[in-house]
Amino acid sequence: MSREYSDTEQRNLDASRRLFAPPPGFDPATLFANDAVWWNGLPRLHAPGAGCEHRGIAAIRRLMGSANADTQHLGIDAYDLGTTRYEDLVELVDGDWVMRQHTMHAKTKAGRDYTNVYCFVMRFDAAGRIVHLTEHWNSWWADRFLFDQLAPTPAHPL
């Protein structure tokens, strides 16, 4: 069942779509308010003790930029955002809220196939910026698949 969206709802839906398919040269961090919060449920993506919240635009920029960092030496086989594609897209819009669920497919930096289901719930302010984003995903699978990818090494006697 479809319905017509209000101008505000359409603006918010368009912004959520730009977050996942930004046009060339567009900085997706500009979609967020300066005091926005991004919660993603996997504390290993943060500084130790930081929990699951990325609070403020600087923290959100660090999170978004971390996908391009070389982390293989740390045993993290991150997915390459340049290889992502989405299927099974579901979008729900209600006033200041947008919910987007999709199945994401990508290659990791080591060339492995990665697939996971994500659900993003976003709340927008009156200016059309994201003030809160909650990222639900199969974090157990991501943790097992993307992290701890260093080969075991034996102890070396003196």
Predicted features along the sequence, with ranges:
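C-terminal and inter-domain tail/linker signature
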Residues: 1-158
